[in-house]
Amino acid sequence: MKAKTTVFGRILKCYDLPLEEVNDLNIQYEKEKSKLNSFGHRLAGRLDSELEFTHLLGQTKLAKTIGECLNDYIDTIEKLGIFNEEKKLHILSCWVNDMKEGEYNPPHTHHDLTGWSTVLFLKVPEYIDDTKDPHKFKDGMLGFISHDSIGTTWAEPKVGEFYIFEAKHQHMVMPFKTKPKGKIRRTMSFNFVQKILENERRSRYDTWLP
């Protein structure tokens, strides 16, 4: 499994997940989409389709691979001396975003700044690149704001790329224009923690985690 680590005051890892497993998740989502509840009331995004997927994640072919990635991330921060607790992880919430042209996610954090968060790109449409100068900003980028808030690290979306980062790491998703019109960009995200707090109900769906 190919992985890269970026360190700039926050620990960010990106994994390339198997496309056949990504396709399976897309198929499962399309089958269940009409029955899923909106999760938008708990999210920062300015988009229409934000649906909860927590109870279905463990049934996908990606579940085992995702569990391996979570453990690898924790192993990384353990080696860096950042984490020294029992490794027993719990997914608190999972949702899928279908983002249309002009929609976006403003700079935000997750889950009261505790634990870790993820972004997995499931579908990426062809963007219109109408910039005339090479130094101009590209639309549709995923941005991670630096620890000192001076700069931002930008990532160009690619299907199968899975990012894991601290919940307190400010990030954002820029709007885009597509060709042909009407295509969506699909991502899945979830929050996970090492310890369940008293005011948090443990999900009965995360027992598949190793």
Residue spans of the language-model regions?
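Non-heme Fe(II)/2-oxoglutarate
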Residues: M1-E86, G102-N105
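Short beta-strand micro-motifs in enzyme catalytic cores
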Residues: I11-K13, I184-M188
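Hydrophobic, well-structured mid-protein blocks that either form specific transmembrane helices
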Residues: G81-F83, K87-C94, T118
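Catalytic core of non-heme Fe(II) oxygenases with the double-stranded beta-helix
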Residues: S93-I164, M172-M174, G182-I184, N191, ...
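A generic "binding-loop/recognition-motif" signal
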Residues: H169
